[in-house]
Amino acid sequence: MKVLLILPTFRYNQGYPSFYSNTDLPTGFAYIASAIRNSGHDVVGLNPNNDPGYKSAYEMVYDKISQSLLKNKPDLIGLGGLSVDFKFIKDAIQIIREKAPETPIVLGGGIINYDVEFIFSTLRPDFCIVGEGEEIIVDLIKMLESGKQDYEEIANLGYWDNGAPKFTKQNFNYIDIDKRAFPDYEPFGISAMLDEFSMATRYVYRYTRPNPRPMTIVSSRGCPYSCTFCIHKKDSKYRKYRSRSIENIMQEIKELYDKYHFNILIILDELFVVNKERLREFCLALIDAHNKFGWDFDWIFQTHPNASIDYETLEMAKKAGCYCFTYGIESASPRVLASMNKKSKPSQFATAINIANTLGIGFYANFIFGDVAETEETIHETMSFFSQYCLDIHISIAAISPYPGSKLFDDCLKKGLISDKMKYYKYIDKQIFNMTKLPNRVWFPWIYLAMYLSKYCQFAKSTNATYCEVDTEDSNNAIALYYKNTMYKIKANCPHCSQENYYRELLRSKEEPFVYSKNSNIFVSFEAFLMRIAGLNIIRYNISKLMVKGLFLLLISFKHPLFKTLKPLMGENEFVPFFTTCCQHCNKRINVNLPMGNNNHRFNTIRKLLKIVIKI
């Protein structure tokens, strides 16, 4: 049997085109591809990404799916993704029904796991797989080949019986995770992604190498914790934590390194390290493999404060090539952390950051605001912690989201904050909820402004580029050609440790005036968040410049003291052309100022008005 597996289109509902690196490729598809191929069947992959030659994402997806169906004539089509992929999956199923109405569709992934009855009944694929799908997809293929319809014999399967949805018995006693075949990325064009689109990955996954080739690996499944915002809630059938043996992980790393010659390894696990002993075991094995095979790559991982990683363990990790590790800090308020069921303390975060700074390892902190316990006081606590510890580290700031499968989602349903599921899924990646104790007029302007400033302001230390020239050897980069950018070779001395760094970045040409057009990310996103605050349709936010200016004046007229917490994000200096990266030696966050034209008066005007009116 021939099976076509279709990846979701990255940021399908947010803006086309959005270039997509292999670090965003869902590994679940690669595991499914491997299981199907190892059972003796053919696998064809379709990766509808990184093709900007269409008017819209839908037009691109329509053409790609239509061509693939005509060329490959599959016997079964597999779709999957997360809740944010709802619109893509809905459109993909409609296209398949139009072009190949007799070909069965099976849907899997997080989107089906946590709201199975609604998603299956709404999107109406022929089958759905709940939970891990490697064995189930093979059993389904065997059943389809036999011509039988004894679907009740297959656990964790959804199907249709006389027009009604039916779901078989549940069995989540999975096989030993070490017995899983390694993922097969080849059907999805990963080699081309490494060659052409590695620069599309976020900077924290590529800054250590001028020619980055990042690769991902998953060494465990599930999570032993049960944070309220996580899809693995306390009573979830899918949260059981299972980790692979270090020996098994090393075997996959060797296979990937020999095949793809990566130089940055991203360990994607929600929780790679549950205790420091496992990290030590991994580091010792990695050091041995480095010496034995001549490996040369940097790596990054995620852990939890309760893993109790100490100075000696992180020192060993650095020796083994680790350049950064991640905590989901979320909040520095004990009250909010308790409400989130994080089981962690701000003192643990501070200790970890201090150790990382001492050793010269990067620290990536994720903050999410908007928990049900969030108040003005808790925001002040978190922003005070941010100001003290986080100005020189990698950070992300976001609003908390009630994703299906989380306790927050259940709470929002009960409270009526989510009253129309179809509308919720349609705008799942475009909406922010107010679950806090704050009034809407304060919460929405504050969180949008916080996210905006954290992305575009120069609050980290800055340094001037000492060298900036065109890289003539990489003038045909696909991303550069589309955006009319140029690949530059850049040198800069770190403002923290004074060491010289060498980067390659896609930038606007020096010969062109450095002016942001109406399509610039900075001003489009700024106008977008203003229109969202006003509750207007985002599609119409360019209709009136006067309206935007008026909304901006309305926003900054808020003199609520909460806005003063944004001071650390504003930075000390005027905005100049720069890019955000990290030092390749001490791994602290830095901004590299560029010798380009500086016509950024619009952004500086915004910044000045914010500082004057909000008085920060």
Regions found by a protein language model. Name each.
Residues 38, 76-78, 106, 250, ...:
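Conserved C-terminal portion of the radical SAM core fold
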Residues 35, 39-176, 401, 405:
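Glycine-rich beta-alpha loop elements in corrinoid/cobalamin-binding modules
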Residues 24, 186-363, 507-518, 581:
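Radical SAM [4Fe-4S] cluster-binding motif and immediate context
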Residues 14-29:
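Glycine- and acidic-residue-enriched helix-capping/strand-helix junction motifs
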Residues 597-616:
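Short, intrinsically disordered terminal segments enriched in charged and Pro/Gly residues
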Residues 4-15, 158-161, 165-172, 204-205, ...:
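C-terminal accessory regions of radical SAM enzymes
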Residues 58-65, 282-288, 375-392:
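Short, electropositive alpha-helical surface patch
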Residues 2-3, 42, 213-216, 499:
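Residues that mark the start of a beta-strand
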